Amino acid sequence: MEEEEFLSRCIRCFQCGEVCENGCIQFNGIDRGLDVAFTPYIHPRTQGCTTCMKCTEVCPTGALQPVAPKEVKMGVARLNEDMCYSFAEPAPRTCGVCYRACPFPGHAMTIGLYDQPQVHPDACVGCGLCEQACVHLPQAIRIIPV
C-alpha cells in the first residue's frame, strides 16, 4: 500500500501499538507534520519488528493489512562492509550477529567466510532485527525504508 493511501486509512487509534508484544511500534508526533501525526512507525535500531502481524489483526480500517511474514516489505537492509567487523582489514573477526538475528536466515541473508553477511534485497522484509542486533556503533547494517 502506498503511503498516501495508508495515511488516508489510518484513524490514529493506536491499537497497533497496544497489541505489539515486541513494542516496536512507535507513533509520530506533531513535530513530523499534521499529515503523519500519531501514525505508527518502526525505528529498527530501537526495536525491530518480529513480523507477528498482530497489528494487522486489530487495525479497524485496513491501513495495516495481513500478509505472509516473508511478503512484508517495510524496507531493505543495507550493509556497509567498511564498518562490518566480519569484513575488517587486515584481520576480519567472526561476528555474524546480524545473520543470527534475521528471522529468515538463508533466505533474506546468508553468510560466508568469517560470518560475512550477504543481504538478499528481494527477500529482505526490512524488519530491522539485524540493525538492532549489530554490535558496531554506528551500526554497519541499516534498514532503508521503501
Outline where the language-model segments fall.
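Iron-sulfur cluster-binding cysteine motifs and their immediate structural context
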Residues: 15-32, 53-70, 95-114, 129-146
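Gly/Gly-Pro-rich "capping" loops immediately C-terminal to redox-active cysteine motifs
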Residues: 31-45, 75-77
